[in-house]
Amino acid sequence: MKILLGNIFDSQCNTLVNTVNCVGVMGKGIALDFKNKYPRMFDEYQALCKSGRVKPGHPYLYRDLTGVSIINFPTKNNWRSPSKFSYISEGLKWFQQSYQALGITSVAFPPLGCGNGGLSWDDVGPEMYRALKDLPIEIEIYAPYGTPQEKLTFQYLEHAKTAHGALEGAKCIPFNDKWLLILEVVRQVNEQRYSLHVGRVIFQKICYVLTRSGIQTGFV
């Protein structure tokens, strides 16, 4: 097993893993890269989603006559939703039970549910390592860009305690239209010829003043 930083498409493994939702959308992140590189795979994926056959916890293998081998691994129901840790665990169990029958001899995984999914490598990395480390095939796991080297080691992944309380990724906060007023103030301040540009401290002061004046910014 190798824990790597880099581009999964540079892998020499026979099978690549793609993270997907269950509604037929590959609009950003690694899924968009897979869509652009393998349009036929995407067409099949959309058809399977429309028929309700793509479900969390149940990855599936796409393989064509040219040798392309891709596991589409659902980490969330809807593309708008965060990824769920339980879907990662269930999907890894599926892989443990299925890789041999599918003829998979080498496989490269992305950091499942991290990035746009909102899950943390500190949780996902150890879970992936423990689920895959004993399988007798070549396995590469690509960590998120910027992951410290010490968190790529087997020692870290073996002994890290997964925070099972973090069952799903970070949720998107509903947009508050009062934030547009904050942005307008920031814009006007930045356009002042002799004013300092807005940084963290000035931004906090703007939010404080607007909140104190009765604007429902949602900040306390």
Where are these regions (language model features)?
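Macrodomain-like recognition of ADP-ribose-binding/processing modules
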Residues: 1-181, 188-204, 208-212, 216-220
